[in-house]
Amino acid sequence: MEQIQMVKVLEKCQVTPPSDTTDVELSLPVTFFDIPWLHLNKMQSLLFYDFPYPRTHFLDTVIPNLKASLSLTLKHYVPLSGNLLMPIKSGEMPKFQYSRDEGDSITLIVAESDQDFDYLKGHQLVDSNDLHGLFYVMPRVIRTMQDYKVIPLVAVQVTVFPNRGIAVALTAHHSIADAKSFVMFINAWAYINKFGKDADLLSANLLPSFDRSIIKDLYGLEETFWNEMQDVLEMFSRFGSKPPRFNKVRATYVLSLAEIQKLKNKVLNLRGSEPTIRVTTFTMTCGYVWTCMVKSKDDVVSEESSNDENELEYFSFTADCRGLLTPPCPPNYFGNCLASCVAKATHKELVGDKGLLVAVAAIGEAIEKRLHNEKGVLADAKTWLSESNGIPSKRFLGITGSPKFDSYGVDFGWGKPAKFDITSVDYAELIYVIQSRDFEKGVEIGVSLPKIHMDAFAKIFEEGFCSLS
């Protein structure tokens, strides 16, 4: 059978919605919220579960149940079985389309690995390539149809580590969903697999709404975003679908509530009589990681390429704005509904004695500017793409995930995950932040860096906390 690094593929199959699904054909328009993500086909989540059972039990029981529950989940998430249709000719807009007659489905890979399960799920340094071997490489284009390129939306790989564990690796095209929506889909699949039925999805808040009419384009953003994305889409259309290779390692850092409070106390002491700033778990965590990252870069660059202390550094993140639209979007709206936020501060400020205060204040200010704009969250949205595109990559750090997501609540019937990972961060200068598995109100921070940079980051991260003791 096919080999992907140290993973043996046992089966490749297509999973469709059940035959009694009402929607035989379904088409959804792309909204202006979706357009900035049309080039990103790798939103990846990786869940590890302890599962001390033999390979035979996995193949005879687990896989049939997962196939059946995934199919039943797709009855309620039909568009995920379909594709993104990207126009070949100008003048047309992309759209999402599902057709039973075309055989639209989700690819499911069943695999086996002899890798060290404890190593892969650990918080210590892990070679990024070892994790990506657990993902099916979803093709960028599967066929052309009339005047459209047909691009798949979701793929799943389930890998067994006999007598040790299971890894569930999900890949989604970002254009169909933001992280909040995709986590809802994963939870719905896990819920149905655990309980064997879909009757209670509504009461579990896992029934999605695909009603695109909710999104009102009051500022002509569709045209603006579509025009600004053309060069990006052209560049990404030339990329292939080969398995990625990274010169990076991964590490997970955990902050307990007590450690977060220590950071908050430091900021409050530094603030003194300065105006009130937003001191939350999110701003504290991101502010601390941002300052550590900027300082660690100084440790690994040569003197000749040292940083200009007056240059700006940028921290980019997105915020769910479903409840801030006019009219508000329901919490179960399935799609992208994200506002772009960018914090900025000079290099000198971030590495200085008050660097943490500066970082937290800048992130809080970006949140206030975007989400609490008196004119509305979309009032200045026409500048979002140009603002982000103008950021130098060496001055950029972004974040995905959220400490609000209950990532460790995804229970397929095997208990909560031993580890939840977001491997998409390997593709850019990104970190992720999610709820901690083991500490109530704590967080986990996933970092992906070249080894020499990771060593410098880890040293600064740990020393920062030692200074708080």
UniProtKB/Swiss-Prot annotation:
It is found in: Cytoplasm. It holds the Pfam family Transferase. Belongs to the plant acyltransferase family. The N-terminus is blocked. Cannot use malonyl-CoA as a donor. One of its GO terms (cellular component) is cytoplasm. It catalyses: an anthocyanidin 3,5-di-O-beta-D-glucoside + (E)-4-coumaroyl-CoA = an anthocyanidin 3-O-beta-D-glucoside 5-O-beta-D-[(6-O-(E)-4-coumaroyl)glucoside] + CoA. Transfers hydroxycinnamic moieties to the glucosyl groups of anthocyanin. It comes from Gentiana triflora (Clustered gentian). Its EC number is 2.3.1.153. GO terms for molecular function: anthocyanin 5-(6'''-hydroxycinnamoyltransferase) activity. The active site is at H174, D411. Expressed in the outer epidermal cells of petals, but not in sepals, leaves or stems. This is Anthocyanin 5-aromatic acyltransferase. Activity enhanced by manganese ions and inhibited by p-chloromercuribenzoate. Keywords: Acyltransferase, Cytoplasm, Transferase.
